[in-house]
């Protein structure tokens, strides 16, 4: 009896807290929350399943598979929609998600942010109109990338990113959905799945829900940027001038780390020609996550260096799709499919080049470049620092790209050397000089490759 009375009361109290959190978050963010953020998840799902293209895809799926009835095809579509569509919870986002992300990142890194092409810091983003859909376009180096970008953009807007197969399964799926991320299967070729994903992305952009995409489509395998993967980008730009979206604004974001959590396992998979993370057994993926969380406990105690060094994000100049179309003298909605693909590829290349041009120059990348250039002999710590300073001087034209912990170059370089030693990428000899462990040389090359295109200029 007491339980029956208490349950509605608890629900009501929780609902009031969520509404209060939504209002506070809406007031705190410079761009506020999109109106569609306040829709219930079931509303999104019903709207998506009622979409004309989705209904046609369900009928086609039913025709192509004689063993599925129309009702079963509809159920399959609902399961797909429920897997993709997030259930944004402002209370969780504000009280748990942001707090947890901020503290974990600060525990692991010196977090740095820069605006290389803008002397007035981030004021150029004040020109973005509210009826524009904002899309942060970034490179992809780690599975913590979206959390780093959400943390950096927290004052501005709540960003909805796509998460891959690693986020499937309890409890990750529920947590990822609660902070507004949608989950996708990147290699899924089922036409029904692709149609539902396409229409969801179209709906979200047309409702001006801020988005984030990783233009490479997967983690970098060698430290350098991959060619642009155009699937989600193509879906997003189709929403131009639909619904509330009067323009699409792309904001380039370049991410770089001294070290990231899965670098060693990624390197081992590539070296052994194994399949990517998504194909790993879920049990072992969860086990690895639990192991990482336990290791975090050891990082709580005060220490001179951050365990993973610097994490840096540079934001570039916004690119308006309307202005880009004017420059190209074209309207993407008026061209044929073949011509459209070429133009989307051109847009992807433009965004990739912008990201590469603002790539953060981290201490680890500098040290790795210096050691690889002088790998024939051993180097003392003082020699490494001297050569690193010479390289930094030669890159002075890119000073705005350089993000240094505590604004102390010497400290940052020492920290990078400390991390390399801890990872056993370099070792100290009898004469206190350093040499590269050949078995881990590829990891050193990985970090150097992130700025190789800048060093060569």
Where does each model-flagged region fall?
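Membrane-interfacial terminal anchoring regions of lipid-handling membrane enzymes
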Residues: 1-212, 217-457
